[in-house]
Amino acid sequence: MNAFDKVIGYKATKRELLQLCDMLRNREIYEEMGARLPHGLLLYGDPGLGKTLLARCFVEESGLHTITVRRDKGSDAFIDGITQAFASAKTKAPSIVLLDDMDKFANEDDTHCDAPEYAAVQAGIDDVKDTGVFVIATANDIRKLPSSLRRSGRFDRKIGLQAPTASDAEEIITHYLKTKQVSDSVNMEDLTRMMRYNSCAELETILNEAAVRAAFARKTGIDMEDMVSVVLKQQYGAQEDMPRVSDEVIEKVALHEAGHLVVCEALCPGSVGFASLLPSDENRCGGFIHCCKGASDSQSAIIALGGKAAVETRYAGQVAEGCSDDIACAVNCIREAAAKEGTLGFSLLNVESDSSSDMSESLNARSEAAVQAELERYYGKARALLAQNEVFLKEITEALVMKKTLLYSDIQAIRGTAVKKNPAVTCEAASRYDAAEIENFPPEDPEEAMRQKIMRKLEEAERRRCS
């Protein structure tokens, strides 16, 4: 049992911190090996990830006298406090100086890197070097710190904290639920797959809000309805009630979201954590899905066009409304892949120097033509996937209209039933589907036809540019 056991997750980080604590407690062993204690430890990462908690556990595990410095005074008094903290730690060595939220020590103006607060910290670190004083600092954004402060020699060991992984999140949720009354209806897999893992603090807040909701309703325990409602509200800004709209509008929204979901599941099976028709901060028109597994840029582009493809396939001759964000997302995915990875060939890579911020006119014309061609191709793939998964699409749409929100277990149950009726296809199978029927590609070699189409688009764009 050690002080770090109270921190859930971060196994690799805790091992590294335990090693440093062992060095502080048993310097002679390491010195005999010719190893010296690193100069300083800097923990950094987004707010709420547990940097301060880990630093406090480090202090507790080390057992050394510790002086904590955080910005709680005016500038002059604070600078004096920094100097006094290092001087006091030096007289009580071996000891620790903890600089909490060090990136907030100075104002965030253009000259904050040269602020006297950071100069005082640097002077203090240099003054206690090799005196038995160990310095720990936490920061949200180390880019706000002077490079001279965060360099090796002042902070030899830098540890960046990331948002919890899926397994970390499940461990954190399980830990916090131990202190709460929980109904048997809570499905841990559904819960972890629908949540975003932004920080440990956010996960704790969500579980507490679920407990508040259950207590207010005078329930005997937190149930899945409480969990889902709080996650949708806290993480997605979703309203609890559907807006008053016609059945036809609800059905179209459901079909649109089902299109995204089915394409996503076909390309990346088991990737959709949940789907909902409720309006959210990100989509005030209503409807969104959460993918709990990462997709490639090309897959993301196809998924983004799935909603439009579903509606326009069902309502032939109609152009789906409210798809501008989806199209913009698909375009961005195509451009990212083309610019960074050369997915459309080297001719579309911007190889100009970084000092030139504007893309050349010729390159821009070629890029726009290629993006348009790729949009058509990916739209065709989305329609092909939906045609192959017609039963799955129909049943997801009906379930969304009825339940408004589908969890991971709901989606997989529907998928399992649909597969028995009409086996769902994978991305590879979709590429063999008769895209010729949609895009007039020769069925024997659709990829070559696509390349020829892109070349014709590029030639047409070049002719327009030169005319």
Predicted segments with their positions:
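Walker A/P-loop NTP-binding motif of AAA+ ATPase domains
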Residues: 2-192
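Soluble catalytic regions of large protease machineries
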Residues: 46, 250-254, 261-467
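Short, conserved phosphate/pyrophosphate- and ester-handling motifs at nucleotide-, phospho-/glycolipid
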Residues: 10, 199, 256
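Short active-site segment of divalent metal-dependent hydrolases/proteases
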Residues: 103, 258-260
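Conserved C-terminal "switch" segment of AAA+ ATPases
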Residues: 134, 147, 161-226, 237, ...
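Short pre-active-site segment immediately N-terminal to the catalytic Zn-binding motif
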Residues: 240-253
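Ca2+-coordinating acidic residues in Ca2+-binding motifs
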Residues: 101, 226, 410
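Terminal C-lobe "cap" of eukaryotic-type protein kinase domains
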Residues: 230-234
